[in-house]
Amino acid sequence: NNLYPICSDFERDFPSVCFALATGVGKTRLMGAFVAYLHLAKGIKNFFVLAPNLTIYNKLIEDFSNPNHPKYVFKGIGEFAQNQPRMITGDNYLQTSQMTLFHSEVNINVFNISKINAETRSGVEPRIKRLSEYLGESYFNYLSNLDDLVLLMDESHHYRADRGMQ
């Protein structure tokens, strides 16, 4: 048993894992594999993928949502061929209602920290934290109250700055 120690305690109330991998080795594909595994093995259906800038944000949306894209992260995963995950982005989440969220087996939220930070610079509360008439609460609060939300951060070293912590 000493050859393969088992982790029994985390510094937080939730497990936190970090992968420091070189450019081009497939970090986005690894995120897709995490989503597939956590859904199929553990029944988790809510994921939040955070991008540090607009370029990576657009790339993540394409890689997670377009089965015809060469870098589609769920290629070969039969369970997602018939029931593709619902893609909720920083551009379309305001049109999302709780009813539509319950109809999807897997919800993948992709947001861009730069867009959220731009709103805080003007002294205004970010839209994600404002009341949504569709949900009856802010989308931020809705996400915060999900018991099974998994946060995936691409280029996570960008988020420790003061504005990212807000």
Labelled PLM ranges:
Residues N1-Q166:
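RecA-like P-loop NTPase motor core of helicase/translocase proteins
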